[in-house]
Protein backbone atom coordinates (compact mmCIF):
# COMPACT_ATOMS: atom_id res chain seq x y z
CA UNK A 1 0.00 0.00 0.00
CA UNK A 2 1.35 3.38 -1.00
CA UNK A 3 1.43 5.84 1.87
CA UNK A 4 0.17 9.34 0.98
CA UNK A 5 2.17 12.22 2.41
CA UNK A 6 1.35 15.87 2.63
CA UNK A 7 5.02 16.81 2.82
CA UNK A 8 8.42 15.47 3.79
CA UNK A 9 11.00 17.69 5.43
CA UNK A 10 14.67 17.04 6.07
CA UNK A 11 15.74 17.78 9.65
CA UNK A 12 19.16 19.27 10.32
CA UNK A 13 21.03 19.56 13.62
CA UNK A 14 20.27 23.26 14.00
CA UNK A 15 16.73 23.91 12.92
CA UNK A 16 15.40 27.40 13.37
CA UNK A 17 11.88 28.33 14.34
CA UNK A 18 9.35 28.34 11.54
CA UNK A 19 6.24 30.45 11.30
CA UNK A 20 4.22 28.01 9.23
CA UNK A 21 1.28 26.36 10.93
CA UNK A 22 2.62 22.83 10.44
CA UNK A 23 6.17 23.55 11.54
CA UNK A 24 5.45 23.33 15.30
CA UNK A 25 4.78 19.62 14.74
CA UNK A 26 8.15 19.23 13.07
CA UNK A 27 9.92 21.22 15.78
CA UNK A 28 8.21 19.18 18.47
CA UNK A 29 9.18 15.97 16.72
CA UNK A 30 12.80 17.03 16.58
CA UNK A 31 12.70 18.06 20.24
CA UNK A 32 11.37 14.66 21.25
CA UNK A 33 14.01 12.93 19.15
CA UNK A 34 16.74 14.98 20.76
CA UNK A 35 15.48 14.17 24.24
CA UNK A 36 15.46 10.49 23.36
CA UNK A 37 19.02 10.74 21.95
CA UNK A 38 17.78 9.26 18.71
CA UNK A 39 20.04 9.15 15.67
CA UNK A 40 17.14 10.59 13.66
CA UNK A 41 17.30 13.87 15.56
CA UNK A 42 20.17 15.28 13.49
CA UNK A 43 19.41 14.27 9.94
CA UNK A 44 16.26 12.50 8.76
CA UNK A 45 13.11 12.81 6.71
CA UNK A 46 9.96 13.66 8.67
CA UNK A 47 6.82 12.72 6.75
CA UNK A 48 3.31 13.68 7.83
CA UNK A 49 0.31 11.75 6.57
CA UNK A 50 -2.51 13.63 4.86
CA UNK A 51 -5.12 11.12 6.06
CA UNK A 52 -7.12 13.16 8.56
CA UNK A 53 -8.96 10.07 9.81
CA UNK A 54 -5.71 8.48 10.96
CA UNK A 55 -3.72 9.84 13.89
CA UNK A 56 -1.82 8.93 17.02
CA UNK A 57 -2.68 9.85 20.60
CA UNK A 58 -0.67 10.23 23.79
CA UNK A 59 -2.42 10.00 27.19
CA UNK A 60 -2.82 13.36 28.89
CA UNK A 61 -1.20 13.79 32.32
CA UNK A 62 -3.35 13.86 35.44
CA UNK A 63 -3.09 17.63 35.84
CA UNK A 64 -4.98 17.94 32.55
CA UNK A 65 -8.02 16.44 34.29
CA UNK A 66 -8.02 19.37 36.75
CA UNK A 67 -6.79 22.28 34.64
CA UNK A 68 -8.71 21.74 31.40
CA UNK A 69 -11.91 23.84 31.28
CA UNK A 70 -15.09 22.75 29.57
CA UNK A 71 -17.93 24.67 27.98
CA UNK A 72 -21.54 23.77 28.68
CA UNK A 73 -24.14 23.84 25.93
CA UNK A 74 -27.78 23.53 26.94
CA UNK A 75 -30.70 22.80 24.65
CA UNK A 76 -34.25 23.26 25.97
CA UNK A 77 -37.69 22.25 24.82
CA UNK A 78 -41.24 22.60 26.11
CA UNK A 79 -44.64 21.82 24.68
CA UNK A 80 -45.24 25.47 23.91
CA UNK A 81 -41.65 25.99 22.73
CA UNK A 82 -41.02 22.79 20.84
CA UNK A 83 -37.31 22.42 20.40
CA UNK A 84 -34.70 21.69 21.08
CA UNK A 85 -33.36 25.25 21.02
CA UNK A 86 -30.13 26.66 22.42
CA UNK A 87 -30.69 28.16 25.83
CA UNK A 88 -29.02 31.38 24.65
CA UNK A 89 -31.99 32.26 22.42
CA UNK A 90 -34.55 31.72 25.18
CA UNK A 91 -35.05 35.42 25.87
CA UNK A 92 -35.68 36.13 22.19
CA UNK A 93 -38.34 33.42 21.97
CA UNK A 94 -39.97 34.49 25.23
CA UNK A 95 -40.67 37.91 23.69
CA UNK A 96 -43.47 36.28 21.70
CA UNK A 97 -45.42 35.64 24.94
CA UNK A 98 -47.08 38.03 27.36
CA UNK A 99 -45.42 38.29 30.79
CA UNK A 100 -46.97 35.83 33.20
CA UNK A 101 -46.79 35.57 36.97
CA UNK A 102 -46.60 31.96 38.17
CA UNK A 103 -49.13 30.89 40.77
CA UNK A 104 -51.06 27.77 41.58
CA UNK A 105 -54.29 28.90 39.91
CA UNK A 106 -52.94 28.28 36.38
CA UNK A 107 -54.97 25.57 34.72
CA UNK A 108 -52.95 25.34 31.49
CA UNK A 109 -49.57 23.66 32.14
CA UNK A 110 -48.12 25.31 29.04
CA UNK A 111 -48.70 28.71 30.64
CA UNK A 112 -46.89 27.58 33.76
CA UNK A 113 -43.97 26.38 31.64
CA UNK A 114 -43.69 29.78 29.96
CA UNK A 115 -44.02 31.52 33.32
CA UNK A 116 -41.30 29.31 34.79
CA UNK A 117 -38.93 30.11 31.93
CA UNK A 118 -39.73 33.83 32.12
CA UNK A 119 -39.07 34.02 35.85
CA UNK A 120 -35.78 32.14 35.64
CA UNK A 121 -34.71 34.27 32.69
CA UNK A 122 -35.48 37.54 34.48
CA UNK A 123 -33.63 36.48 37.62
CA UNK A 124 -30.55 35.68 35.55
CA UNK A 125 -30.04 32.18 36.89
CA UNK A 126 -29.93 30.52 33.49
CA UNK A 127 -28.79 27.93 32.70
CA UNK A 128 -31.24 26.53 35.21
CA UNK A 129 -29.25 23.44 36.15
CA UNK A 130 -25.78 24.95 35.73
CA UNK A 131 -23.56 26.76 38.18
CA UNK A 132 -24.84 29.83 40.04
CA UNK A 133 -21.99 32.25 40.51
CA UNK A 134 -21.42 35.95 40.89
CA UNK A 135 -18.46 35.75 38.50
CA UNK A 136 -19.39 37.19 35.13
CA UNK A 137 -17.20 36.69 32.12
CA UNK A 138 -17.08 39.49 29.54
CA UNK A 139 -17.36 37.14 26.60
CA UNK A 140 -20.46 35.16 27.50
CA UNK A 141 -21.75 36.70 30.76
CA UNK A 142 -23.08 33.92 32.99
CA UNK A 143 -23.78 31.63 30.06
CA UNK A 144 -21.36 28.93 29.08
CA UNK A 145 -23.30 27.82 26.07
CA UNK A 146 -22.51 30.64 23.65
CA UNK A 147 -19.67 28.81 21.93
CA UNK A 148 -20.70 26.82 18.89
CA UNK A 149 -19.77 23.19 19.52
CA UNK A 150 -18.02 20.76 17.22
CA UNK A 151 -20.06 17.58 17.08
CA UNK A 152 -18.98 14.22 15.80
CA UNK A 153 -15.65 12.44 15.79
CA UNK A 154 -12.58 14.22 14.51
CA UNK A 155 -10.74 11.03 13.61
CA UNK A 156 -11.84 7.42 13.54
CA UNK A 157 -8.47 5.64 13.34
CA UNK A 158 -6.64 6.96 16.38
CA UNK A 159 -4.11 4.70 18.10
CA UNK A 160 -3.28 5.22 21.78
CA UNK A 161 0.48 4.89 22.18
CA UNK A 162 0.59 4.00 25.90
CA UNK A 163 -1.58 3.29 28.93
CA UNK A 164 -3.75 6.17 30.17
CA UNK A 165 -3.58 6.99 33.90
CA UNK A 166 -7.33 7.61 34.17
CA UNK A 167 -10.42 6.63 32.18
CA UNK A 168 -14.15 7.22 32.57
CA UNK A 169 -16.85 4.70 31.76
CA UNK A 170 -20.59 5.16 31.38
CA UNK A 171 -23.28 2.80 30.16
CA UNK A 172 -27.08 2.89 30.19
CA UNK A 173 -29.38 0.08 31.18
CA UNK A 174 -31.36 0.79 28.03
CA UNK A 175 -28.91 1.23 25.17
CA UNK A 176 -31.62 2.73 22.97
CA UNK A 177 -31.36 5.94 24.99
CA UNK A 178 -27.57 6.17 24.61
CA UNK A 179 -25.12 7.38 21.98
CA UNK A 180 -22.18 4.97 21.83
CA UNK A 181 -18.92 6.83 21.21
CA UNK A 182 -16.40 4.01 21.62
CA UNK A 183 -14.77 1.79 24.19
CA UNK A 184 -11.15 1.57 25.28
CA UNK A 185 -9.85 -1.85 26.36
CA UNK A 186 -9.09 -2.29 30.05
CA UNK A 187 -5.40 -2.81 29.32
CA UNK A 188 -5.10 0.81 28.16
CA UNK A 189 -6.56 2.27 31.38
CA UNK A 190 -4.65 2.36 34.68
CA UNK A 191 -7.84 3.20 36.58
CA UNK A 192 -11.44 3.67 35.43
CA UNK A 193 -14.25 5.67 37.05
CA UNK A 194 -17.70 4.14 36.65
CA UNK A 195 -20.36 6.77 35.92
CA UNK A 196 -24.02 5.79 36.19
CA UNK A 197 -26.88 8.02 35.00
CA UNK A 198 -29.72 7.89 37.49
CA UNK A 199 -33.27 7.07 36.52
CA UNK A 200 -34.62 8.33 39.84
CA UNK A 201 -36.26 11.69 40.50
CA UNK A 202 -36.01 14.21 43.28
CA UNK A 203 -38.69 16.63 44.47
CA UNK A 204 -37.39 19.96 45.71
CA UNK A 205 -39.10 22.66 47.72
CA UNK A 206 -38.23 25.90 45.95
CA UNK A 207 -38.18 27.83 49.21
CA UNK A 208 -35.32 25.68 50.51
CA UNK A 209 -33.29 25.58 47.29
CA UNK A 210 -30.38 27.93 46.93
CA UNK A 211 -30.70 27.90 43.17
CA UNK A 212 -34.30 29.14 43.18
CA UNK A 213 -34.16 31.46 46.18
CA UNK A 214 -34.11 34.57 43.92
CA UNK A 215 -37.17 33.26 42.11
CA UNK A 216 -39.15 32.86 45.32
CA UNK A 217 -38.09 36.30 46.57
CA UNK A 218 -39.43 38.14 43.53
CA UNK A 219 -42.37 40.48 44.24
CA UNK A 220 -45.67 38.99 43.12
CA UNK A 221 -44.31 35.47 42.92
CA UNK A 222 -46.92 33.04 44.26
CA UNK A 223 -45.34 29.86 43.01
CA UNK A 224 -45.73 27.40 45.86
CA UNK A 225 -45.88 24.08 44.04
CA UNK A 226 -42.85 21.81 44.48
CA UNK A 227 -40.77 20.86 41.44
CA UNK A 228 -39.45 17.45 40.50
CA UNK A 229 -36.12 17.09 38.74
CA UNK A 230 -34.31 14.22 37.09
CA UNK A 231 -31.95 12.64 39.57
CA UNK A 232 -28.18 13.26 39.60
CA UNK A 233 -25.63 10.81 38.19
CA UNK A 234 -23.38 8.77 40.44
CA UNK A 235 -19.71 7.84 40.45
CA UNK A 236 -18.12 4.64 41.68
CA UNK A 237 -14.39 4.20 41.91
CA UNK A 238 -14.20 0.79 43.48
CA UNK A 239 -11.81 2.10 46.12
CA UNK A 240 -12.27 2.82 49.87
CA UNK A 241 -14.02 6.14 50.36
CA UNK A 242 -14.34 8.76 53.09
CA UNK A 243 -16.35 11.92 53.78
CA UNK A 244 -15.06 14.94 51.92
CA UNK A 245 -14.25 18.05 53.97
CA UNK A 246 -16.80 20.83 53.66
CA UNK A 247 -15.57 23.68 51.49
CA UNK A 248 -17.35 26.95 52.28
CA UNK A 249 -14.86 29.16 50.42
CA UNK A 250 -15.53 27.92 46.90
CA UNK A 251 -18.99 26.54 47.56
CA UNK A 252 -20.89 29.06 45.45
CA UNK A 253 -18.52 28.70 42.52
CA UNK A 254 -19.15 24.98 42.12
CA UNK A 255 -21.44 23.79 39.32
CA UNK A 256 -24.54 24.11 41.46
CA UNK A 257 -27.59 22.14 40.40
CA UNK A 258 -31.07 21.97 41.95
CA UNK A 259 -30.28 18.65 43.62
CA UNK A 260 -27.18 20.12 45.28
CA UNK A 261 -27.11 22.05 48.53
CA UNK A 262 -24.33 24.45 49.34
CA UNK A 263 -22.56 23.59 51.51
CA UNK A 264 -23.34 19.97 50.85
CA UNK A 265 -25.12 18.14 53.58
CA UNK A 266 -24.53 15.38 54.22
CA UNK A 267 -20.88 15.52 53.30
CA UNK A 268 -19.80 14.32 49.87
CA UNK A 269 -18.03 11.03 49.30
CA UNK A 270 -14.37 11.18 48.31
CA UNK A 271 -11.87 8.65 47.01
CA UNK A 272 -8.11 8.71 47.27
CA UNK A 273 -6.23 7.18 44.34
CA UNK A 274 -2.53 6.68 43.69
CA UNK A 275 -1.81 6.64 39.98
CA UNK A 276 1.23 6.79 37.74
CA UNK A 277 1.82 9.19 34.89
CA UNK A 278 2.41 7.69 31.45
CA UNK A 279 5.98 8.99 31.27
CA UNK A 280 6.92 8.59 34.94
CA UNK A 281 6.29 5.23 36.59
CA UNK A 282 8.64 5.85 39.52
CA UNK A 283 6.79 8.79 41.11
CA UNK A 284 3.11 8.08 41.83
CA UNK A 285 0.58 10.89 42.21
CA UNK A 286 -2.22 10.87 44.78
CA UNK A 287 -5.52 12.47 43.90
CA UNK A 288 -8.91 12.86 45.58
CA UNK A 289 -12.26 12.63 43.82
CA UNK A 290 -15.45 14.28 45.09
CA UNK A 291 -18.42 12.23 43.91
CA UNK A 292 -20.92 15.04 44.61
CA UNK A 293 -19.32 17.73 42.47
CA UNK A 294 -17.26 15.28 40.35
CA UNK A 295 -14.18 17.24 41.28
CA UNK A 296 -10.60 15.94 40.99
CA UNK A 297 -7.84 17.47 43.10
CA UNK A 298 -4.18 16.49 42.97
CA UNK A 299 -2.22 16.47 46.19
CA UNK A 300 0.53 19.05 46.12
CA UNK A 301 -1.21 21.09 43.39
CA UNK A 302 -3.16 24.28 43.77
CA UNK A 303 -6.92 24.01 43.59
CA UNK A 304 -7.96 25.42 40.19
CA UNK A 305 -11.29 26.73 41.51
CA UNK A 306 -12.99 29.10 41.01
CA UNK A 307 -11.12 29.73 37.75
CA UNK A 308 -12.36 26.57 36.06
CA UNK A 309 -15.88 25.56 37.03
CA UNK A 310 -16.24 22.52 34.78
CA UNK A 311 -13.61 19.80 34.81
CA UNK A 312 -13.65 17.00 32.22
CA UNK A 313 -14.99 14.57 34.81
CA UNK A 314 -17.83 16.99 35.62
CA UNK A 315 -18.72 17.39 31.97
CA UNK A 316 -18.67 13.66 31.36
CA UNK A 317 -20.87 13.00 34.40
CA UNK A 318 -23.40 15.81 33.91
CA UNK A 319 -23.87 15.23 30.17
CA UNK A 320 -27.39 14.00 29.68
CA UNK A 321 -31.07 14.85 29.45
CA UNK A 322 -32.95 16.31 32.40
CA UNK A 323 -36.61 17.13 32.88
CA UNK A 324 -38.50 19.40 35.24
CA UNK A 325 -42.02 18.63 36.40
CA UNK A 326 -44.41 20.61 38.59
CA UNK A 327 -46.43 19.06 41.35
CA UNK A 328 -50.01 19.86 40.40
CA UNK A 329 -52.66 19.06 43.01
CA UNK A 330 -56.06 18.56 41.44
CA UNK A 331 -59.15 19.75 43.33
CA UNK A 332 -62.20 17.56 42.81
CA UNK A 333 -65.79 18.77 42.74
CA UNK A 334 -66.42 17.44 46.23
CA UNK A 335 -63.47 19.44 47.52
CA UNK A 336 -61.03 16.58 47.68
CA UNK A 337 -57.42 16.90 46.43
CA UNK A 338 -55.63 14.33 44.28
CA UNK A 339 -51.91 14.39 45.13
CA UNK A 340 -48.80 13.26 43.24
CA UNK A 341 -49.83 14.52 39.83
CA UNK A 342 -46.91 16.11 37.99
CA UNK A 343 -47.10 17.99 34.72
CA UNK A 344 -44.06 18.31 32.51
CA UNK A 345 -42.63 21.82 32.26
CA UNK A 346 -39.24 21.82 30.55
CA UNK A 347 -36.68 19.35 29.17
CA UNK A 348 -33.01 20.26 29.16
CA UNK A 349 -30.16 18.58 27.28
CA UNK A 350 -26.60 19.02 28.58
CA UNK A 351 -23.56 18.68 26.33
CA UNK A 352 -20.00 19.58 27.30
CA UNK A 353 -17.12 20.59 25.05
CA UNK A 354 -13.44 20.89 25.84
CA UNK A 355 -12.38 24.51 25.83
CA UNK A 356 -8.63 23.96 25.61
CA UNK A 357 -6.87 23.50 22.29
CA UNK A 358 -4.88 20.31 21.91
CA UNK A 359 -6.89 18.19 24.38
CA UNK A 360 -9.38 15.61 23.13
CA UNK A 361 -11.55 12.81 24.41
CA UNK A 362 -10.45 9.45 23.03
CA UNK A 363 -13.25 6.90 23.06
CA UNK A 364 -12.26 3.64 21.41
CA UNK A 365 -10.53 4.69 18.19
CA UNK A 366 -12.36 8.01 17.80
CA UNK A 367 -11.49 11.44 19.19
CA UNK A 368 -14.03 14.07 20.22
CA UNK A 369 -14.07 17.68 21.35
CA UNK A 370 -17.67 17.47 22.56
CA UNK A 371 -19.29 14.53 24.29
CA UNK A 372 -22.91 13.92 23.29
CA UNK A 373 -25.55 14.34 25.97
CA UNK A 374 -26.31 10.63 26.39
CA UNK A 375 -22.85 9.32 25.57
CA UNK A 376 -21.86 5.81 26.53
CA UNK A 377 -18.53 4.03 26.34
CA UNK A 378 -15.04 4.30 27.83
CA UNK A 379 -13.04 7.48 27.25
CA UNK A 380 -9.88 9.24 28.37
CA UNK A 381 -8.10 12.54 27.73
CA UNK A 382 -5.35 12.53 25.12
CA UNK A 383 -3.08 14.74 23.07
CA UNK A 384 -3.60 13.99 19.39
CA UNK A 385 -1.05 14.41 16.62
CA UNK A 386 -0.89 13.28 12.99
CA UNK A 387 0.76 10.09 11.84
CA UNK A 388 4.47 10.94 11.57
CA UNK A 389 7.05 8.60 10.10
CA UNK A 390 10.81 9.00 10.01
CA UNK A 391 13.04 7.94 7.15
CA UNK A 392 16.84 7.98 6.96
CA UNK A 393 18.26 10.96 5.14
CA UNK A 394 19.89 8.74 2.52
CA UNK A 395 16.61 7.12 1.54
CA UNK A 396 15.01 8.34 -1.65
CA UNK A 397 11.45 9.55 -1.38
CA UNK A 398 9.43 8.68 -4.46
CA UNK A 399 7.10 11.68 -4.25
CA UNK A 400 7.92 15.39 -4.56
CA UNK A 401 7.89 17.65 -1.54
CA UNK A 402 4.50 19.11 -0.68
CA UNK A 403 2.78 16.70 -3.08
CA UNK A 404 -0.34 14.61 -2.65
CA UNK A 405 -0.20 11.11 -4.13
CA UNK A 406 -3.42 9.06 -4.07
CA UNK A 407 -2.97 5.77 -2.27
CA UNK A 408 -4.93 3.96 -4.98
CA UNK A 409 -2.22 4.63 -7.60
CA UNK A 410 0.42 1.85 -7.66
CA UNK A 411 4.05 2.88 -7.34
CA UNK A 412 4.97 1.11 -10.58
CA UNK A 413 2.36 3.09 -12.48
CA UNK A 414 3.61 6.37 -11.05
CA UNK A 415 7.16 5.55 -12.14
CA UNK A 416 6.03 4.59 -15.65
CA UNK A 417 4.00 7.73 -16.13
CA UNK A 418 5.66 9.95 -18.75
CA UNK A 419 4.53 13.17 -20.41
CA UNK A 420 2.42 12.12 -23.35
CA UNK A 421 2.94 14.91 -25.87
CA UNK A 422 6.78 15.03 -25.79
CA UNK A 423 6.79 11.25 -26.06
CA UNK A 424 4.57 11.32 -29.15
CA UNK A 425 6.65 14.04 -30.76
CA UNK A 426 9.84 12.07 -30.13
CA UNK A 427 8.39 8.93 -31.69
CA UNK A 428 7.29 10.91 -34.74
CA UNK A 429 10.77 12.30 -35.36
CA UNK A 430 12.40 8.92 -34.83
CA UNK A 431 10.06 7.14 -37.25
CA UNK A 432 10.52 9.84 -39.88
CA UNK A 433 14.31 9.73 -39.80
CA UNK A 434 14.55 5.97 -39.30
CA UNK A 435 14.06 5.12 -43.01
CA UNK A 436 17.51 6.37 -43.94
CA UNK A 437 18.74 8.34 -46.93
CA UNK A 438 17.05 6.09 -49.46
CA UNK A 439 13.64 6.95 -48.19
CA UNK A 440 14.35 10.48 -47.06
CA UNK A 441 11.89 12.10 -49.46
CA UNK A 442 9.03 9.75 -48.69
CA UNK A 443 9.68 9.82 -44.95
CA UNK A 444 9.82 13.61 -44.98
CA UNK A 445 6.44 13.80 -46.70
CA UNK A 446 4.94 11.39 -44.19
CA UNK A 447 6.49 13.29 -41.33
CA UNK A 448 5.01 16.50 -42.72
CA UNK A 449 1.58 14.91 -42.67
CA UNK A 450 2.09 13.57 -39.17
CA UNK A 451 3.36 16.91 -37.97
CA UNK A 452 0.38 18.66 -39.50
CA UNK A 453 -1.98 16.21 -37.84
CA UNK A 454 -0.15 16.67 -34.53
CA UNK A 455 -0.36 20.43 -34.87
CA UNK A 456 -4.10 20.25 -35.46
CA UNK A 457 -4.49 17.88 -32.51
CA UNK A 458 -2.56 20.19 -30.20
CA UNK A 459 -4.69 23.12 -31.21
CA UNK A 460 -7.87 21.12 -30.64
CA UNK A 461 -6.58 19.94 -27.25
CA UNK A 462 -5.76 23.49 -26.21
CA UNK A 463 -9.21 24.67 -27.27
CA UNK A 464 -10.87 21.83 -25.37
CA UNK A 465 -8.82 22.51 -22.23
CA UNK A 466 -9.74 26.20 -22.26
CA UNK A 467 -13.41 25.31 -22.74
CA UNK A 468 -13.29 22.80 -19.88
CA UNK A 469 -11.50 25.30 -17.64
CA UNK A 470 -14.21 27.88 -18.29
CA UNK A 471 -16.84 25.31 -17.36
CA UNK A 472 -14.95 24.38 -14.17
CA UNK A 473 -14.58 28.04 -13.17
CA UNK A 474 -18.31 28.57 -13.68
CA UNK A 475 -19.20 25.40 -11.78
CA UNK A 476 -16.82 26.29 -8.95
CA UNK A 477 -18.52 29.64 -8.53
CA UNK A 478 -21.91 27.99 -8.26
CA UNK A 479 -20.61 25.37 -5.80
CA UNK A 480 -18.98 27.98 -3.58
CA UNK A 481 -22.21 29.98 -3.49
CA UNK A 482 -24.14 26.86 -2.50
CA UNK A 483 -21.49 26.03 0.11
CA UNK A 484 -21.83 29.44 1.74
CA UNK A 485 -25.61 29.09 1.75
CA UNK A 486 -25.41 25.65 3.38
CA UNK A 487 -22.98 26.93 6.01
CA UNK A 488 -25.44 29.66 6.91
CA UNK A 489 -28.31 27.19 7.14
CA UNK A 490 -26.46 24.74 9.42
CA UNK A 491 -24.36 27.34 11.23
CA UNK A 492 -25.77 26.30 14.62
CA UNK A 493 -24.48 22.78 14.05
CA UNK A 494 -20.97 23.81 13.14
CA UNK A 495 -21.26 24.18 9.38
CA UNK A 496 -21.80 21.78 6.50
CA UNK A 497 -18.77 19.56 7.11
CA UNK A 498 -19.41 19.07 10.81
CA UNK A 499 -23.13 18.55 10.19
CA UNK A 500 -22.35 15.78 7.70
CA UNK A 501 -19.43 14.53 9.84
CA UNK A 502 -17.24 14.41 6.76
CA UNK A 503 -13.99 15.91 5.67
CA UNK A 504 -14.13 19.40 4.32
CA UNK A 505 -13.38 19.71 0.63
CA UNK A 506 -12.20 23.00 -0.77
CA UNK A 507 -11.81 24.16 -4.38
CA UNK A 508 -8.22 24.96 -5.41
CA UNK A 509 -8.19 27.20 -8.46
CA UNK A 510 -5.55 25.96 -10.89
CA UNK A 511 -6.90 27.90 -13.86
CA UNK A 512 -3.64 29.83 -14.20
CA UNK A 513 -1.63 26.64 -14.62
CA UNK A 514 -4.16 25.22 -17.07
CA UNK A 515 -4.27 28.36 -19.19
CA UNK A 516 -0.46 28.56 -19.20
CA UNK A 517 -0.26 24.96 -20.40
CA UNK A 518 -2.87 25.66 -23.08
CA UNK A 519 -0.89 28.67 -24.28
CA UNK A 520 2.22 26.50 -24.56
CA UNK A 521 0.22 23.99 -26.58
CA UNK A 522 -0.94 26.72 -28.94
CA UNK A 523 2.61 28.00 -29.38
CA UNK A 524 3.80 24.48 -30.11
CA UNK A 525 0.98 24.00 -32.60
CA UNK A 526 1.88 27.28 -34.31
CA UNK A 527 5.53 26.26 -34.59
CA UNK A 528 4.61 22.88 -36.00
CA UNK A 529 2.18 24.46 -38.46
CA UNK A 530 4.81 26.90 -39.69
CA UNK A 531 7.36 24.13 -40.08
CA UNK A 532 4.93 21.88 -41.90
CA UNK A 533 3.91 24.53 -44.47
CA UNK A 534 7.43 25.63 -45.29
CA UNK A 535 8.63 24.48 -48.69
CA UNK A 536 12.20 24.87 -47.50
CA UNK A 537 11.54 22.14 -44.99
CA UNK A 538 9.99 20.05 -47.74
CA UNK A 539 13.28 20.40 -49.69
CA UNK A 540 15.19 19.19 -46.68
CA UNK A 541 17.41 22.30 -46.47
CA UNK A 542 16.05 23.84 -43.33
CA UNK A 543 18.24 22.16 -40.69
CA UNK A 544 21.49 23.06 -42.52
CA UNK A 545 20.81 26.74 -43.29
CA UNK A 546 20.63 29.67 -40.93
CA UNK A 547 17.29 31.32 -40.47
CA UNK A 548 18.30 34.62 -42.15
CA UNK A 549 19.50 32.80 -45.26
CA UNK A 550 16.41 30.65 -45.39
CA UNK A 551 14.26 33.75 -45.71
CA UNK A 552 16.34 34.96 -48.73
CA UNK A 553 16.31 31.67 -50.60
CA UNK A 554 13.21 32.40 -52.65
CA UNK A 555 14.37 35.70 -54.26
CA UNK A 556 17.93 34.41 -54.75
CA UNK A 557 16.75 31.32 -56.58
CA UNK A 558 14.44 33.42 -58.75
CA UNK A 559 17.30 35.72 -59.78
CA UNK A 560 19.62 32.77 -60.52
CA UNK A 561 17.01 31.20 -62.77
CA UNK A 562 16.66 34.44 -64.72
CA UNK A 563 20.44 34.76 -65.19
CA UNK A 564 20.95 31.18 -66.31
CA UNK A 565 18.15 31.11 -68.83
CA UNK A 566 18.49 34.73 -70.03
CA UNK A 567 19.96 33.95 -73.58
CA UNK A 568 17.40 31.32 -74.30
CA UNK A 569 14.66 33.48 -73.02
CA UNK A 570 15.86 36.44 -75.11
CA UNK A 571 16.15 34.35 -78.30
CA UNK A 572 12.76 32.87 -77.76
CA UNK A 573 11.36 36.27 -77.03
CA UNK A 574 13.01 37.84 -80.14
CA UNK A 575 11.91 35.06 -82.42
CA UNK A 576 8.45 35.19 -81.04
CA UNK A 577 8.27 38.94 -81.46
CA UNK A 578 9.62 38.79 -85.05
CA UNK A 579 7.20 36.10 -85.98
CA UNK A 580 4.35 37.95 -84.49
CA UNK A 581 5.37 41.15 -86.30
CA UNK A 582 5.75 39.40 -89.68
CA UNK A 583 2.41 37.77 -89.31
CA UNK A 584 0.86 41.06 -88.38
CA UNK A 585 2.40 42.94 -91.35
CA UNK A 586 1.49 40.23 -93.80
CA UNK A 587 -2.08 40.09 -92.64
CA UNK A 588 -2.46 43.86 -92.67
CA UNK A 589 -0.86 44.74 -96.13
CA UNK A 590 -2.02 41.81 -98.27
CA UNK A 591 -5.37 43.39 -99.36
CA UNK A 592 -3.88 46.79 -100.12
CA UNK A 593 -1.26 45.34 -102.53
CA UNK A 594 -3.88 43.51 -104.55
CA UNK A 595 -5.89 46.73 -105.00
CA UNK A 596 -2.84 48.64 -106.18
CA UNK A 597 -2.00 45.99 -108.79
CA UNK A 598 -5.59 46.04 -109.96
CA UNK A 599 -5.51 49.77 -110.43
CA UNK A 600 -2.33 49.54 -112.52
CA UNK A 601 -3.83 47.13 -115.03
CA UNK A 602 -7.06 49.10 -115.65
CA UNK A 603 -7.40 52.01 -118.22
CA UNK A 604 -9.08 55.33 -117.89
CA UNK A 605 -12.30 55.78 -120.02
CA UNK A 606 -14.72 58.70 -120.49
CA UNK A 607 -17.96 58.19 -118.93
CA UNK A 608 -21.02 58.26 -121.25
CA UNK A 609 -23.14 61.40 -121.37
CA UNK A 610 -26.44 59.59 -122.00
CA UNK A 611 -28.10 57.22 -119.61
CA UNK A 612 -27.51 53.59 -120.43
CA UNK A 613 -30.14 51.52 -122.05
CA UNK A 614 -32.04 48.86 -120.23
CA UNK A 615 -30.87 45.93 -122.41
CA UNK A 616 -27.26 47.04 -122.04
CA UNK A 617 -27.52 46.34 -118.37
Curated annotation (Swiss-Prot):
A motif (CX6CC) lies at residues 497-505. Residues 1-17 form the signal peptide. Residues 420-440 are annotated as: Fusion peptide. Gene3D superfamilies: 1.10.287.210. Disruption phenotype: Embryonic lethal with no survival beyond stage 14.5 dpc. Embryos show retarded growth but otherwise have no significant morphological defects. Placental development is abnormal with significantly reduced vascularization of extraembryonic tissues. In the placental labyrinth, there is an expansion of trophoblast cells which reduces available space for fetal blood vessels. Trophoblast cells fail to fuse and form syncytiotrophoblast layer I (SynT-I), however development of syncytiotrophoblast layer II (SynT-II) is not significantly affected. The mature protein consists of a trimer of SU-TM heterodimers. The SU-TM heterodimers are attached by a labile interchain disulfide bond. This is Syncytin-A. It comes from Mus musculus (Mouse).
Amino acid sequence: MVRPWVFCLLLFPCSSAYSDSWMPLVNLTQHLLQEANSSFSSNCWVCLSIQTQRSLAMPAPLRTWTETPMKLRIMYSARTLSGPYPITDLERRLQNFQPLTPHSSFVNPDQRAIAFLQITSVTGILPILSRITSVRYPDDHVYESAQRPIWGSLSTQTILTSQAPLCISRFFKNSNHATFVGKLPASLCNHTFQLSPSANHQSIDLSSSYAFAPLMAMPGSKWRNPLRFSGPPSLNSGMPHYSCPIDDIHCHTYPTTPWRSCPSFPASTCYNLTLFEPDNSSHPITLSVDTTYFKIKLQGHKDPYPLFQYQPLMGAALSGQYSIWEYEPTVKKNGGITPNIFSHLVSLTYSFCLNSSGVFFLCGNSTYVCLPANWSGVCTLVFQYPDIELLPNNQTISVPLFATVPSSVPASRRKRALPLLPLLAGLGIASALGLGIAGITTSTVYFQQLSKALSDSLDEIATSIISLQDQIDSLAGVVLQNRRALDLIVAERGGTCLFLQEECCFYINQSGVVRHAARKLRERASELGTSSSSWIQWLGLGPWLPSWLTSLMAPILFILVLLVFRPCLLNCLTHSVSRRMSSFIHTTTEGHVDKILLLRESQYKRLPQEPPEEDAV
